[in-house]
Amino acid sequence: LGDVEMTEEAHDFINRGLMLFPDNLILKDELCYNLEIEGDIKRAIEVCNELIDKNPYSNDYWFTLGRLYSISGDYEKAIEAFDFALTCDDSNEELKILKAYCLYMNENYEKAIEVYNDIATTDDIHIRITPLLAECYIKLENYEKAYVLLKELLRQNRQLKDSSIYINYIRCCVETGRDKEASDALMQASRLFPKNIRILSLLALTYLENGDEHKAMEATERLFTALDQVEDKQQEDFE
């Protein structure tokens, strides 16, 4: 029922079942999922802990608990839960990605890098984690390492849809003295993301610094037009 957005009906069904079978782990697992869908993360965490009390060696329960803590912003507890999950099964790459994300959010960038580098990458996972790994290096001000990662990623995938990858790449080019490369990347990004607020801001500033007032004005007008259409903007246009 929960999968077809009938959360109230699902919750009622689960509660009726638990009244009859209060120790049924399948029903409690469904309740935990349903509470998460409803946005009651605190109660979902409580139920998940009850599940772990019954089966402390379940990778799935610890993974769920870590994910719930990450949603609530309690990254320290999320990391702890993920560590327990990994002792049960260390082959879950999605779990490692989430753990690395929580380490990043907890400002433990060196450890996040270790976890990212420990992930067995397929092509799809490589595309997902390389920008995240680069962001860790940027936080550590190791712009050269981040530059190498992002340059290779963009070389292999010329039509990436994540504007933040280009923005971080441009920053790394600037920080490492590759001004021509930064300019070329900015031009490419402006073509791929013509309504992106941050890219338009960078474009206008670059033209202004280069003394091209006409193009700076054009870019600024495009920026104002994009800002006027905020209600139609996708989140990526602000990244």
Predicted region positions:
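Register position in tetratricopeptide repeats
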Residues: D3, I37-E38, I71-S72, M105-N106, ...
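Start-of-helix register in tetratricopeptide repeats
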Residues: I26, D60, E94, R128, ...
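Short coil turns that delineate tetratricopeptide repeat
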Residues: P22, P56, D90, D124, ...
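Canonical positions in the second alpha-helix
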Residues: R16-G17, E50-L51, F84-A85, D118-I119, ...
